[in-house]
Amino acid sequence: MTIIRKKHPLIKIINHSFIDLPAPSNISSWWNFGSLLGLCLIIQILTGLFLAMHYTSDTATAFSSVTHICRDVNYGWLIRYMHANGASMFFICLFLHVGRGIYYGSYNMIETWNMGIVLLFAVMATAFMGYVLPWGQMSFWGATVITNLLSAIPYIGTTLVEWIWGGFSVDKATLTRFFAFHFILPFIITALVLVHLLFLHETGSNNPTGLNSDADKIPFHPYYTIKDFLGVLILLMAFMILTLFFPDILGDPDNYTPANPLNTPPHIKPEWYFLFAYAILRSIPNKLGGVLALILSIVILAFMPLLHTSKQRALTFRPITQTMYWILVADLLILTWIGGQPVEYPFIIIGQTASIAYFTIIVILMPMAGMFENNILDLD
């Protein structure tokens, strides 16, 4: 078996990636989220495939087909809720994975980090288009509002929006193409994940100290396969509790009303995992400015390696920057809350303050804290 594992051209790749891979001996449970994201992607592709067998991407029948899946298809309700809540679990793991990367300075592996940002954009695009497919009120109006943001692009904006819509409003053509893209994107994401892993295995994993761990490596299997499996069990348990006991807790009640272009919901808002970006978008009174801030809220991650001023890689031994980091986490939670609130006092001013704080912490305060720590630790 050992000979096949090490000699067979295909199994050899798997062996070098998941079995005989040299891994740092001290990586914590924060390093579990990569494998959990892989599991989430598999769950989403499988449940999505079964949903696609019964779904029809036509404005006249889309809502009814989802109802049919829940009522008439064997375990259709389970597949539908697994897919909907699987997206939430996916984003929880994604945010924790990115947060881990920022905390431990993993962004210094630039190729891996940038590939991760591309993956984040791809997953966000997939989730947005998936939310449109049930063709409920929030599906329709969410699609209308978010695609309309492109009209802020000077000169070509309006033409671009109508080109994406396939007409003069969100209609049958829009739904059909969103379904096509929503179906193909997870497979593109799978390919990007392999590239992400390829880049990661060029440098090897980071570790909680941020120090070089070449002198102390252990094989990935059995140590981290067992450790990852525990993470998988915890995730699946949380996932099934969410899906079976609280399936609608993260959804919007408006999406149980069929799409009606003549009736606007009182509060148009995206799914919870986009609320932080939506709050940043809304905090700027100018349309183009809001769109740029929205994009920048994610793109700013690509500048993390340039903004790294500390002589140390991780935040493990840097209490001042640690404080900034946890304020940033709290700020993101505030933005998420504000994104779900109506546009009125005091939510407007809270959202604007939190948006300014978000960019200030990342661009100014954390780099300054890094330089200050170098100074007081005499690391210059």
From Swiss-Prot:
InterPro entries attached to this UniProt entry: Cyt_b/b6_C (IPR005798), Cyt_b/b6_C_sf (IPR036150), Cyt_b/b6_N (IPR005797), Cytb/b6-like_sf (IPR027387), Cytochrome_b (IPR030689), Cytochrome_b_C_euk/bac (IPR048260), Cytochrome_b_N_euk/bac (IPR048259), Di-haem_cyt_TM (IPR016174)
Species this chain originates from: Microtus socialis
Binding-site list for heme b b566: H97, H196
Positions of transmembrane segments: 33-53, 77-98, 113-133, 178-198, 226-246, 288-308, 320-340, 347-367
One term under GO cellular component: respiratory chain complex III
Cofactor(s) needed by this chain: heme b
Origin: domain of life: Eukaryota
Protein's UniProt name: Cytochrome b
